[in-house]
């Protein structure tokens, strides 16, 4: 039968991509249906119980700046918060939160159920309704037909999913959930290029069987960070420690002894796994010179004894898993509550997508998340938000929008995927962005919230908070420029103590803040209003003032790179001598010998960051010249 109501947007899948896609479309006023095989698993954290990290928190903050749910849910569920790279520059600082699985899932479900214009329905999707070369709806497992203007597929690991534990395997979308076989078969009949990827998860451990006294405690940060621009520490539940232990040579012997029954090393698994989140058997094999690897013991939540041992993801047989866990210090008597496993699934070449994440072959059909070859909750959420937003724009017959590489990490993610494709699960890093000083996690709202408001994704309360912050930054910056400290005054003497050098002329507070020795905290000793400035305003001002020169140069670089795209590359250029290029990129450039920067940028695997390095190298050797027409 046909469902009595038609929709503007149908989202298939209720994971991190699907929930953000459905919420984005509904926020924009589109009648949206979220179709999930199980309402109880909406927003489920299928793998590690954490949000954020290097490169990933930048995506979370951008999703938040555009009105998404992930950061707010993390603030409601986060049981430990840390800022990674806190001693490094602001471009690479990243917030990471350990999350209570149950609280996170509950927060997402509450947000979904209270979102206007959003309908949730429990049924697996088996087929797509087609009208010519466009999708026009979805057919469920029981034959129910839902009609819509657009469809967003966020199927995660469910398409043709196969779970492996040792040499045993069975069909599954994840442990305890059935795979999507009929839909996978239907998509394979379409002209998309399909491949197989794999990911894995470690065995879960009962905390009551672990000796934490021999492990290193890893507390959260004080003061406690927040993830959302609308969040606060008051939202956080009780905070807890994580712990660190290590594998040892005995562990590695056990793993090597089980390799003959590893589905990865016996050819049973054909899919490629994530390079930057390898299984423990992969680590032991690839890094045979190391006699130990860190294992982070992470609590799964406040109301459970289960632990997530981050660092020993495995698909080895269960008897080997048992031995390797028991060989690790502090886990000699550990009880495994769930075995580790690998899952292999279909993905589709993201080069078959537009920047909007609409497919090139089927109109009004959008892909987001692991179906595009990415790995990670944060990467999925970012794609989901973009796909849901563009599906709504398509339904409203409006022009699609996607951020440029210099506007957002979301732009970097999408551009990387559709330009270069991927042969392994794609993970975001700050190193993938050539404009990372502009794309900090702390300024995601200043970069994107105004655009989000224009697109209809920002509610009045978030807009009010954003405008107040932006105005406060402008006011305080102007005030710092207007307050001067004259030499030979009491404030000048105080400033000299802080700077460890005399002031020989007058300085504004703004000028003093530019000095590397002067921090916001020190500046507050010279001016009471500085001390009273809210943290989020002070943070922006300190970064903007101290890094103004670098930021201006990066802005100029963006403009220059556009102008210099057709610059000629010398035929005798020695790519092996260019510092910063990976060996893979050096090899490709040497083989192809591109004539111009533009041609170099189109070589698969040559990143925009590498093109920027080429441009810098050419300037240094003074060999920049335009290719004649």
Swiss-Prot record:
GO cellular component, one term: cytosol
Gene Ontology biological-process annotations: tRNA methylation; tRNA wobble uridine modification
Annotated residues for binding of NAD(+): 273-287
Record: residues binding FAD: 13-18
Gene Ontology molecular function: flavin adenine dinucleotide binding
Main location, first listed in the record: cytoplasm
One matching Pfam family: GIDA_C_1st
Keywords tagged on the record: Cytoplasm, FAD, Flavoprotein, NAD, tRNA processing
Entry annotated with the keyword NAD: yes
Cofactor(s) of this protein: FAD
UniProt cross-references to SMART domains, sorted A to Z: GIDA_assoc_3
Source taxon at top rank: Bacteria
UniProt keyword Signal, yes or no: no
Compartments, as annotated in UniProt: Cytoplasm
Family: Belongs to the MnmG family.
Function per UniProt: NAD-binding protein involved in the addition of a carboxymethylaminomethyl (cmnm) group at the wobble position (U34) of certain tRNAs, forming tRNA-cmnm(5)s(2)U34.
HAMAP family (alphabetical): MnmG_GidA
Protein name, per record: tRNA uridine 5-carboxymethylaminomethyl modification enzyme MnmG
